Amino acid sequence: KIMQTFKEYHEDGEHERVKERIAILPGGFKPPTRGHFLAMQDLLNDAERGIVYIGKGERDGIDATKSKAIWDIYKNYLSKPTEVHLSPISPVKDTYDYALDNKEVDIIVGAGGPRKLKGDTFTDGDMKRYESFIKNKDKYPHVTLKEIESKEDIKGEVVRAAIKANIDDALINYFPDMSETDKDAIKSILTA
């Protein structure tokens, strides 16, 4: 907003906020898709900067190092500065550790909610992993848990299969818009 009335200024509460706000998006990201990119962008709308924690492990030839290399390209397209870290144990642990060690900042943690899997089965998503932030509000008063809506129902196994079938189509259908140079870089990462 460029201009607002005095009443609006006091009602929105922004004038009272003095703590820095950090958005955290933890996950596996094998690979990071357009949906992940859009989720981080959405979280950054309410923060000054972001942190992505990437889980270890490998799925169909895509490991954490490849995932980080792709996020390092994505962060150039995000609206706010974003750090990308490989989690030595798990993104969940790193998120809780960061919250415990950084009580002087406000933290927004993004986690996927319930969604449909194959057939008629559903998953609870990742929200359950971060319930302690809600249950222990006295311990984590500076943390807000934000459910990430599945704007695009893109599943990792579908993306990995599409990459194997036709990587050029996969880049168009499952990855964010970016320069041809960056698309080529991601293609090289995924086919290495």
What is each model feature region?
Residues Q4-A192:
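Nucleotidyltransferase catalytic core that binds NTPs
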